[in-house]
Amino acid sequence: MNKDYRPGQDTRPLFDRIAPRYDLLNRLLSFGIDRRWRLAAVRELALAGAGRILDAATGTGDVALSIAAAYPRAEVVGVDLSMNMLRAAVPKLLPAEGRITLLQASCESLPLAAETCDAAIIAFGIRNVLQRQVALQEFSRVLKPGGRLLVLEFSQPTNPLLAGLYRCYSRHVLPRIGGLISDGAAYRYLPDSVEAFPARGEFLGMMEQSGFRHVRHRDLTGGIVTLYSGCRSLPGD
């Protein structure tokens, strides 16, 4: 594990630093596939009609904007701990015409009343949360009974060949490009944070312990990314 990353470290300063080039590097380093991953998660929300959707760790607002476009009657609340990320999001969200609200807060302490969201999503953010179980419990608290949670996160590919290629890319290529354009430390942190994240079955267990039912996962792009889903338990479950 490199000297730039320590388990339990507050990553807010890191994300504040990379905010100006965050979108550019996402497109470049993923070869544009990150957009498809986010859209897959947004489609999975399957919101019927109006509703309030929490976009946790909203970053520069890509997911929030996709939700507003896909569900014209939805209200979106985007929450992020990094103020610089939120500042970068503001001009991008103008097409949503006021249907997206941005709040600076942590996932472990959401500034939302209980049972006020119809669905919640967090894309590429849960691995950076210091207290993941607490965050999952917060998602459960703010969701209405039966409300859906979607978690999109990097994973370890299950195919040994792909896993080796991905590890080589994430360990050696990605940090060099990231260092040239933005902050090398941030992109050295990325592979360490992915490897430190719980295995698929373990994370599904954490969701169940936090009050979610019907939990499942679906691998995307050979398991480089995994989409987790679950529904907040109903009374009597």
UniProtKB/Swiss-Prot annotation:
E.C. designation(s): 2.1.1.163, 2.1.1.201
Gene3D superfamilies: Vaccinia Virus protein VP39
Pfam families for this protein: Ubie_methyltran
Enzyme class at the top of the EC tree: transferase
Chain residues that bind S-adenosyl-L-methionine: 60, 80
Organism superkingdom: Bacteria
InterPro entries named among the record's database cross-references: SAM-dependent_MTases_sf, UbiE/COQ5_MeTrFase, UbiE/COQ5_MeTrFase_CS
Iron in keyword set: no
UniProt keyword annotations, A-Z: Menaquinone biosynthesis, Methyltransferase, S-adenosyl-L-methionine, Transferase, Ubiquinone biosynthesis
GO molecular function terms attached to this record: 2-methoxy-6-polyprenyl-1,4-benzoquinol methyltransferase activity; demethylmenaquinone methyltransferase activity
Pathway(s) of this molecule: Quinol/quinone metabolism; menaquinone biosynthesis; menaquinol from 1,4-dihydroxy-2-naphthoate: step 2/2; Cofactor biosynthesis; ubiquinone biosynthesis
Family classification: Belongs to the class I-like SAM-binding methyltransferase superfamily. MenG/UbiE family.
HAMAP family given in the database record: MenG_UbiE_methyltr
PANTHER family linked to this entry: 2-METHOXY-6-POLYPRENYL-1,4-BENZOQUINOL METHYLASE, MITOCHONDRIAL (PTHR43591:SF24), METHYLTRANSFERASE (PTHR43591)
The protein's role, per its UniProt record: Methyltransferase required for the conversion of demethylmenaquinol (DMKH2) to menaquinol (MKH2) and the conversion of 2-polyprenyl-6-methoxy-1,4-benzoquinol (DDMQH2) to 2-polyprenyl-3-methyl-6-methoxy-1,4-benzoquinol (DMQH2).
Protein name: Ubiquinone/menaquinone biosynthesis C-methyltransferase UbiE
Species of the source: Syntrophotalea carbinolica (strain DSM 2380 / NBRC 103641 / GraBd1) (Pelobacter carbinolicus)
Taxonomy of the source species: Bacteria, Pseudomonadati, Thermodesulfobacteriota, Desulfuromonadia, Desulfuromonadales
Gene name of the record: ubiE
